[in-house]
């Protein structure tokens, strides 16, 4: 079983998400990740960071990194349209976490 940690940036993003159905689908995928260790539609985006793809509406993405084999750090979320910017931001957040 995985345990997740959320960054402030991820928490802000998910709270601001107005599409309730999208939010439910995203949270369900995270729950599946925690309980079943099932990543589903997921791909690497560089520096060990991976993109969890939720194929609904705007094509939501959750960027995360595994830590200590059983902890998933949820870095940030976004949409397909902001994918490159979000990947860059996820990498910056991870570097900041590792610095502290």
Show the residue positions of the predicted features.
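Enriched for short, Lys/Arg-rich terminal
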Residues: 3-4, 12, 23, 38, ...
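A short, surface-exposed loop/turn module that caps and links secondary-structure elements
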Residues: 28-56
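Solvent-exposed, charged helical/coil patches
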Residues: 3-31
